[in-house]
Amino acid sequence: MESPIRFENVDINTILKTLPHRFPFLLIDRVRNIREDYSGIGVKNVTFNEPAFQGHFPDRPVFPGVLMIEGMAQTAGVIGIMSVSGTEKPRAVYFLTIDKCKFRKPVLPGDTVEYHMKSIGRRKTMWWFHGDAVVDGKTVAEADVGAMLTD
């Protein structure tokens, strides 16, 4: 059984208040279904106008895998920050680790990537998440990411 939803939809304005990232490095458009088990889904609408497509690759644009991993990390950051309440609320998230990373299928302009993130561990200010990047119901990438929430 899934845990209850704490935040149903985190829009771009809330993300901008939560994360320090800005264009061209803010790589999520919204986060939905943040649950009490520290899971949630980040959403990235990939368009041909992405700056990375100027060089990756001009004649056959493919969304870079490293940017999907960063999108996973940003989604995890929003989940972590919004899940901590009161005076413990962190002001920054530092991306620390990437493990078990696999890229399975290219992501192209017009795709919507969903970053399905779930906490797999927490110790003090350290958090670990497993993430699956999903397009049209198919996993295109996966990784375990670690981060430190701090003030």
Swiss-Prot record:
Biological process per Gene Ontology, one example term: fatty acid biosynthetic process
GO molecular function terms attached to this record: (3R)-hydroxyacyl-[acyl-carrier-protein] dehydratase activity
Top EC class of this enzyme: lyase
Gene3D superfamilies found in the cross-reference section: Hotdog Thioesterase (3.10.129.10)
GO-annotated cellular components: cytoplasm; membrane
Catalytic center residues: H56
InterPro entries attached to this UniProt entry: FabA_FabZ, FabZ, HotDog_dom_sf
Annotated EC: 4.2.1.59
Catalytic activity: a (3R)-hydroxyacyl-[ACP] = a (2E)-enoyl-[ACP] + H2O
UniProt keyword annotations, A-Z: Cytoplasm, Lipid A biosynthesis, Lipid biosynthesis, Lipid metabolism, Lyase
Coiled-coil intervals, chain numbering: none
Subcellular location as annotated: Cytoplasm
Family affiliation: Belongs to the thioester dehydratase family. FabZ subfamily.
Stored PANTHER family: 3-HYDROXYACYL-[ACYL-CARRIER-PROTEIN] DEHYDRATASE
Functional summary from the UniProt entry: Involved in unsaturated fatty acids biosynthesis. Catalyzes the dehydration of short chain beta-hydroxyacyl-ACPs and long chain saturated and unsaturated beta-hydroxyacyl-ACPs.
Annotated protein name in UniProt: 3-hydroxyacyl-[acyl-carrier-protein] dehydratase FabZ
Organism: Rhodopseudomonas palustris (strain BisB5)
